[in-house]
Amino acid sequence: MHIKEICLEGFKSYATRTVVPGFDPHFNAITGLNGSGKSNILDSICFVLGITNLQQVRAANLQELVYKQGQAGITRATVSVTFDNSERNRSPLGHEDHSEITVTRQIVVGGKNKYLINGKLAQPNQVQNLFHSVQLNVNNPHFLIMQGRITKVLNMKPMEILSMLEEAAGTRMYENKKEAALKTLEKKQTKVDEINKLLEKDILPALEKLRREKSQYMQWANGNAELDRLKRFCVAFEYVQAEKIRDNSIHVVEEMKIKMTGIDEQTDKTQGEISELEKQIKALTQAREASMGGEVKALSDKVDSLSNEVTRELSKLTNMEDTLQGEEKNAEKMVHNIEDLKKSVEERASALNKCDEGAAELKQKFQEFSTTLEECEREHQGILAGKSSGDEEKCLEDQLRDAKISVGTAETELKQLNTKISHCEKELKEKKSQLMSKQDEAVAVENELDARKNDVESVKRAFDSLPYKEGQMEALEKDRESELEIGHRLKDKVHELSAQLANVQFTYRDPVKNFDRSKVKGVVAKLIKVNDRSSMTALEVTAGGKLFNVIVDTEDTGKQLLQKGDLRRRVTIIPLNKIQSHLVPPRVQQATVGKGNAELALSLVGYSEELKNAMEYVFGSTFVCKTTDAAKEVAFNREIRTPSVTLEGDVFQPSGLLTGGSRKGGGDLLRQLHDLAEAETKFRAHQKSLSEIEANIKELQPLQTKFTDMKAQLELKMYDMSLFLKRAEQNEHHKLGDAVKKLEEEVEEMRSQIKEKEGLYKSCADTVSTLEKSIKDHDKNREGRLKDLEKNIKTLKARIQASSKDLKGHENVRERLVMEQEAVTQEQSYLKSQLTSLRTQISTLASDVGNQRAKVDAIQKDHDQSLSELKLIHAKMKECDTQISGSIAEQEKCLQKISDMKLDRKKLENEVTRMEMEHKNCSVKVDKLVEKHTWITSEKRLFGNGGTDYDFESRDPHKAREELERLQTDQSSLEKRVNKKVTAMFEKAEDEYNALMTKKNIIETDKSKIKKVIEELDEKKKETLKVTWVKVNQDFGSIFSTLLPGTMSKLEPPEGGTFLDGLEVRVAFGDVWKQSLSELSGGQRSLLALSLILALLLFKPAPIYILDEVDAALDLSHTQNIGRMIKSHFPHSQFIVVSLKEGMFSNADVLFRTKFVDGVSTVQRTVTKQS
């Protein structure tokens, strides 16, 4: 493959489209003046080949490859190179079917860089692969020989020359890949070390721990299975017992009902006997009354009559004596009142004298005139109206009529009351006599009633003394159900939150026996309490990873935990006695907190005082700020310069570092911990409440049983007493007692009414007497008094009118004193007349009382004689009552028997009710057990059968219940420690372990393979380098001899080494080998270096070679030798040579001459080869 044509447009100095056609397949030369665009043609070829090192084409960037860098209106550079691809055996891979290949590269100023292969867009790597397949790697261009490269070769060290040989042989790429492979081996070894470290420190300990936890889990799971079997056994026994009670209670209830029926029949029979006895008693009583009733009745009537008469007369005597005593007391009272009034008159007379003495004569006269005038006018008006005085509303005749009517009414009512009371007293006496005859019977009934009341009171006291209230157990059971429901909900919530916070849980095994767990305080996050939820995000950012640190009391405790605590994960431990905190100074705190927008993070969390050092270490050096401005002020203020965090979680460091942005779930950890703490607190409170309720229930169960029994006993006693009371109320003595009590109350009430009416009657009679006297006196003096009064009034008015003005000041006092004195005087006179009348009446009453007392004594004597005769007859009747009493006693026995039978029946009723309730409860219990445990239906047939899980004989149910409770306690305790996810975790850890071991084995295998291949390739490299050395050495000598006849050159190892230690260039002139290259001239040295480069190129010839002024330092003869050498040694490669010397391009087959015309390069082709 060789170049046929190059087309340039806008590339460097080629502004317009310029085609450079007809390249010779062998030797082409390009010549022209400096700056005419010779090297730009070579640069265009490198440009198309995809060069990335732009210094090779003398440009700093792709824009400099455009004509005048796009400033002349040309904004793109395009180069197309057409290759002859007629030799199929040397064609690029994938392009064997194309006879020509055109590769185009175009760049646009500020735009894209694109490649085209045969007019189709291609990627840069496609173009590179195309040229790499024919040994044209433009980024390592051994086919491009520049003048500077020759100079470098002369100064190379042995190893550098060996490196060139390796590149020619193709082993250099192997060395690069070998170095990369060795680095890969190092990385793999590092990976293996990491895997081993991970296995040793994390995976294997975790796997071993999970294996132990899995063993615990299997123990817990097996325990659950045993627990389930025990639960089923206990539930089955409970079911069988409830079913047995339910079925048996029906028969027991039926038997009790039969007994109750028998009791009812016996009661009816006894009731019939009682009826017969009543008839018998009635017959005996009638017979007794027939024989002795007449005489007894006559005497009884006489006694009753005399008794009533004694009572009546005695009542009169008592009333008369009371009246006498009352009148005597009234007389004494009147005497006392008269003395008081006398003193009052004297006092008022003295006061009036003093008033008169202290006033002027005119005042005295005016007072007298005024008083006299008023009295005269009042008296005059009263006389005209028919009154005794002027102060009364009715006239004397009306008052007298009303008083007489009141006297008549009072007298009538007194007579009626006396008649009623006589009748009641007679009846009361009869009833009392009958009541006395039944006294023995009443005492017996009373004693029996007291005994029954005492029984009831005794039972009631015992019942009331029980510390149990009705409904208390039901209320507790209801509370227990409520607490259980709430507890289950809270427990689920705690488990859910605990699962979410598994990474905060700190679990460890006691490092030593009897280890004090109080030394381990816990994880920081669980030891703080945040009251303000809005600051949780800021606090979480402030603490960061320290939230998961574990606080212990001393460093020794931490050391024990790390070494022997069997920790599940890596933890950082904070010993309280060693931790050092950097608390913000108080001065800075005060300066900041005073602003109101910033608070020390430590002040926002609650904690135990013993954790103060650790909390200061975690939260003591950062401020939490409400706003971003406040956070900036705290962080960057010279006086404060303290890290700060906003409520949103943005961090400001005094160094200027800011951290912020979106925080997914900021503060969730502390919020979840807060919720977990609240849930655990509530759960513990409800568990405590539930425990208290359970304890109360357990404590109340015996009391409830005793309460139920006592209640039934009390009901029976009260029912028994109520029956006795009903029977006692039907007793004749009870009826008589009620009648006597009622009569006594009526008599007492009527006596009270008589006393009131007698007082009223006396008062009305006195009023009548007084009024009659007043009317009589009034009629005699009326006319004379009227005339005198009118005359006096006329005179007094005239005098008063004349002196009224002067007397006005003393009138009120004088008038009052005169009126009071007159009133007292009148009252005194009235009382004296009343006292005289009263003493006369007292004398009369005393005589009447003596007569009445003699009458009462005579009647009482007759009554006592008749009563003695009646008692003798009653004694005789008592003998007849013995038989009646016997019948009554028999009747009482029958009644007692009925009462006992009713009591027995009540007991049976209560027992039936209890059994029915027990039957109902057991039925409900059976249904609930079946509903709650669905397996009962399918396994019921096995209950109680030998050889099954429900063999109640071989296994004691009570011990099974105790074992169940113990196992539940053990399982509950184990459940708190067991890791329920351990199976999945163990499988995952085991998979990770197996995966790591697989990776490790693969890496170990790859290492072995790589090492083996490297060893094999090292041997092949030696062989290939040796072959290459021999071939290059031969061509090196041949080419140098051609360029400089009479000389020889070779490559040989340093003294005492092999060719793998490097190669040195040796030169001989004739047969003499030079010791150093410094003996050569500059031209000779250039030819030597060029010979070496061409010898290396000849080892694996490329299809194209480019030489850029490699003959610059040579004279003409040496230049001609280069041309001859190229023709002789590279017959299958195309050479494109840039040279200014004719000796070089004279040997070329085609010569291209460049010129610079009007700022644009042009090319002219000349064929020098003869056909």
Curated annotation (Swiss-Prot):
Binding site for ATP: G32, L33, N34, G35, S36, G37, K38, S39
InterPro entries, sorted: P-loop_NTPase, RecF/RecN/SMC_N, SMC, Smc2_ABC, SMC_hinge, SMC_hinge_sf
GO CC annotation, single: chromosome
Biological processes per GO annotation: cell division; chromosome condensation; meiotic cell cycle
Domain Zinc-hook, residue spans: 2-1158
Primary site of residence: nucleus
Gene3D superfamilies associated with the record: 1.10.287.1490, 1.20.1060.20, 3.30.70.1620, P-loop containing nucleotide triphosphate hydrolases (3.40.50.300)
Molecular function terms from GO: ATP binding; ATP hydrolysis activity
Highest taxon above the source species: Eukaryota
Keyword Nucleus carried by entry: yes
Keywords noted in UniProt: ATP-binding, Cell cycle, Cell division, Coiled coil, DNA condensation, Meiosis, Mitosis, Nucleotide-binding, Nucleus
Cellular localisation: Nucleus
Tissue expression notes: Highly expressed in roots and young floral buds.
Domain SMC hinge intervals: 518-635
Record function comment: Central component of the condensin complex, a complex required for conversion of interphase chromatin into mitotic-like condense chromosomes. The condensin complex probably introduces positive supercoils into relaxed DNA in the presence of type I topoisomerases and converts nicked DNA into positive knotted forms in the presence of type II topoisomerases. Also involved in chromosome segregation in meiosis.
Record-linked PANTHER family: STRUCTURAL MAINTENANCE OF CHROMOSOMES PROTEIN 3
Subunit structure: Forms a heterodimer with SMC4. Component of the condensin complex, which contains the SMC2 and SMC4 heterodimer, and three non SMC subunits that probably regulate the complex: CAPH, CAPD2 and CAPG.
The name this protein goes by in its record: Structural maintenance of chromosomes protein 2-2
Organism from which the protein derives: Arabidopsis thaliana
Gene: SMC2-2
